[in-house]
Amino acid sequence: MRELFATKTCPYCIEVREQLEWDALDFIEYDVEVDGAARARLRELVGANPMVPVLVEEGRVSQVGVSGRGCYVGNG
């Protein structure tokens, strides 16, 4: 199962979410702005200063940001 770590307002997250939906791919989305456990897992996956969107496939990070761009997640 694909997992998308994102925020509702990040334009890069919106782009990845819309592409996954357009491609009719199943995924679970975690909003790291409101879900502390998801934010902690995101940090485990990509480090202390994570950038979203992060796409995880089969337990492995397959994408961070979009073409090197993304939105940084605060300490929340």
Each language-model region and where it sits:
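Glycine-/small-residue-rich active-site loops that bind phosphorylated ligands and cofactors
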Residues: 11, 34, 62
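Structural micro-motif
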Residues: 46-56
